């Protein structure tokens, strides 16, 4: 029987025609794509595969950009605070920043947004007390000695960040690509004409792959190699700023955004902190612009009979695939690069026709983490196996229509075991897809809600890949949930107050005090506490992790302490008597103590998170001191979610924590996965309670 092909996208490369076509056959590719810096030859284009063509709409226009340097993208930057030792202080604006990435914008409109701050007093310095010396690149400030000062200014971005990263990583010697700002009408006119001509010139293209739209996630590089990365945040809107957008915002919203609204005392506004009204207004404003102008570009693509897919990374800011109006863009598909299971769920949950995941490792000499991949010291096959283990468990829970690779195909030469393993993965993926095609997988009756400040808008993600957000308990929880047999929904605090919570059996709140994930000042709302307290009393489970519901200025640190049966002492109760067991649990998390006599300490093993339980009415509060995703903790979480149930007798629960099962009733097929590097004999019970057994090699997938 001929091997099934399809649902796989391969990166092609001129000069590597033989390799491209050979691997397309082995991996079952039905689509070929280009990558940044590569082209597809006629031989590849005529090979019978559909063609994805990658465009980054805001770069690759250097001829136009050089003639219109005032139409480049911008951002606010702020100098590091500097201490005045005399009554005058000189601050060199670009001293802290990578001069190949930024240039000062001192146009009259841009200059009107500049600010100087006395950070010692927290006061804005009057404009009469400072001046800009263009010829020296310095701001001269009349100061109070021994106070610290910083300067906030608009800067042009003169090297598009993803191109900059690819350039440095791959040791390119090419012209630096400048990002153009589409907010200007002149840029819009140019880009619409360019898109029209591009479609005419690329008759062989079936799918235009937008990478992505207009604004990259913020990525500020510094002047010192030892601290090159000054700030990066995958979901931040810092790079959407321009003098034109600021002026238009003021006209539409009736108030002006200032430099300090973005700089925020030098802390900037990380996604991990709750968003205030100004930030949410700005996000809404930029999203509306992206939707309007992006829709015009997509209409042109459709006019030429091509499909439009968008990459859910890089210049994705303003796209907001989980916004209610995302479908109005008109995209035919979405593509997400994935390291982890939560990113599969993130991709699959977007309302569009086609979902495609881009597997890792990318075909780059060095991976995103900085370690060698397709170069000396790298082991791309082992990398692929470990990534696939995380991705696979989520793929068995939700459908994704396509899979593929990115990068430079010639790099796989010399790695035949990687080529073999990708052939195995592509076959596995198609098998899993067909099971979803026949019907949904079996799911536990427990529905889980994840409660935080962003709610649905940041479903499954926090702000970037796992290796960028690992410090947060919630990303570990999301990763664990991504492959478990539970329906999961993300909601914000307003929704928790205004919708029927009875659809949930469990609500999870996890994060550091003051973070967006814990909730910050949202917990000062008595209505929120009323709704959640009532819901737990009537039978719900509130599962708090880290510092859930934590806020200062109230009678308890954890506002749900009455439900959880534990609270956190920040020093106010250090002289108060406490229930037995408080001293023991405070060794695991300093300051933690029992608020109720009947709070049970269920698990206090050094290698696992502390777990406490407290009955409240018909429901209960469960507290975990922390959560790190691993097979043991994932099993623990699963058990906690199905309280009052003999977990080990439930269907499709394996006797080995390193293995997992997914059952597809319509096909009457079970997927058994070995998530470890060792051979396993795995047992589980089917729906009839009968025991089944499978012998699995390391990392193996078995479908039967």
Model-predicted segments: where are they?
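Short helix-loop-beta junction
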Residues: 467-490
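Structural motif
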Residues: 33, 209, 335, 505-515, ...
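Catalytic domains of carbohydrate-active enzymes, especially glycoside hydrolases
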Residues: 4-54, 194-209, 390-400, 480, ...
């Amino acid at each position: 029987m001929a091997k099934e092909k399809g649902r796989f996208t391969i990166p092609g490369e001129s000069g590597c025609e033989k390799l491209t076509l050979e691997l397309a056959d082995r991996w079952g590719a039905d689509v070929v794509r280009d990558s940044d810096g590569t082209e597809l030859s006629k031989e590849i284009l005529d090979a019978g595969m559909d063609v994805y063509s990658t465009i980054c709409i805001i770069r690759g226009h250097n001829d136009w950009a050089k003639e219109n340097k005032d139409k480049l993208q911008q951002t606010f930057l702020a100098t590091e605070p500097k201490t005045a030792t005399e009554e005058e202080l000189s601050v060199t604006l670009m001293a802290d920043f990578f001069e190949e990435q930024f240039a000062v914008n001192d146009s009259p409109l841009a200059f009107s947004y500049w600010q100087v701050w006395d950070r010692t007093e927290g006061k804005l310095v009057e404009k009469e007390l400072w001046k800009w010396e263009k010829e020296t690149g310095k701001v001269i400030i009349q100061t109070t000695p021994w106070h610290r000062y910083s300067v906030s200014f608009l800067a042009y971005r003169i090297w598009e960040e993803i191109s900059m990263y690819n350039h440095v990583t791959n040791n390119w010697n090419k012209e630096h690509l400048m990002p153009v700002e589409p907010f200007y009408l002149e840029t819009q006119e140019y880009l619409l004409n360019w898109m029209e001509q591009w479609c005419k010139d690329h008759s062989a293209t079936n799918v235009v792959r937008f990478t992505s739209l207009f604004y990259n996630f913020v990525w500020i590089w510094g002047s010192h190699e030892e601290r090159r990365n000054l700030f990066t945040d995958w979901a931040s809107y810092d790079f959407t700023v321009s003098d034109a957008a600021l002026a238009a915002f003021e006209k539409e919203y009736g108030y002006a955004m200032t430099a300090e609204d973005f700089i925020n005392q030098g802390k900037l506004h990380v996604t991990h902190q709750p968003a205030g009204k100004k930030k949410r207004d700005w996000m809404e404003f930029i999203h509306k612009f992206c939707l309007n102008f992006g829709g015009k570009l997509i209409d042109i693509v459709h006019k030429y009979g091509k499909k439009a897919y968008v990459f859910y990374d890089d210049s994705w800011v303003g796209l907001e695939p989980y916004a209610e109006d995302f479908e109005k863009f008109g995209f035919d598909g979405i593509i997400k690069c994935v390291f982890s299971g939560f990113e599969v769920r993130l991709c699959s949950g977007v309302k569009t026709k086609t979902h495609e995941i881009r597997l890792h490792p990318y075909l780059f000499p060095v991976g995103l983490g900085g370690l060698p991949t397709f170069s000396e010291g790298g082991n791309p096959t082992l990398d692929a196996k470990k990534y696939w283990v995380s991705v696979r468990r989520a793929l068995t829970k939700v459908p994704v229509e396509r899979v593929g690779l990115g990068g430079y195909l010639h790099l796989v030469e010399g790695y035949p075991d990687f080529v073999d393993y990708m052939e195995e993965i592509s076959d596995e993926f198609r098998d899993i897809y067909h099971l979803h095609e026949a019907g949904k997988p079996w799911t536990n009756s427990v529905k889980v809600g994840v409660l935080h400040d962003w709610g649905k808008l940041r479903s499954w993600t926090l702000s970037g890949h796992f290796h960028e957000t690992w410090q947060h308990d919630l990303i570990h929880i999301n990763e664990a949930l991504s492959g478990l047999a539970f329906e999961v929904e993300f909601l914000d605090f307003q929704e928790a107050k205004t919708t029927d919570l009875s659809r949930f059996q469990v609500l999870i709140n996890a994060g550091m005090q003051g973070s967006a994930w814990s909730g910050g000042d949202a917990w000062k709302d008595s209505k929120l506490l009323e709704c959640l307290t009532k819901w737990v009393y009537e039978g719900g489970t509130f599962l708090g992790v880290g510092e859930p519901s934590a806020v200062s200025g109230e009678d308890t640190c954890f506002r749900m302490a009455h439900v959880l049966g534990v609270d956190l002492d920040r020093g106010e109760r250090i002289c108060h008597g406490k229930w037995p067991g408080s001293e023991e649990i405070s060794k695991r998390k300093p300051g933690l103590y029992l608020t109720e006599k009947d709070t049970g300490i269920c698990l206090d093993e050094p290698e696992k998170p502390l777990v406490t339980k407290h009955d409240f009415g018909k429901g209960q509060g469960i507290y975990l001191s922390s959560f790190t995703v691993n097979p043991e903790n994932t099993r623990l979480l699963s058990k906690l979610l199905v309280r009052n149930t003999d977990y080990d007798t439930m269907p499709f629960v394996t006797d080995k924590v390193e293995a997992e099962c997914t059952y597809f009733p319509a096909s009457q097929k079970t997927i058994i996965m070995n998530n470890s590097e060792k051979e396993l004999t795995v047992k589980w019970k089917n729906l009839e309670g009968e025991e089944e057994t499978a012998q699995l090699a390391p990392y193996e997938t078995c479908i039967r």
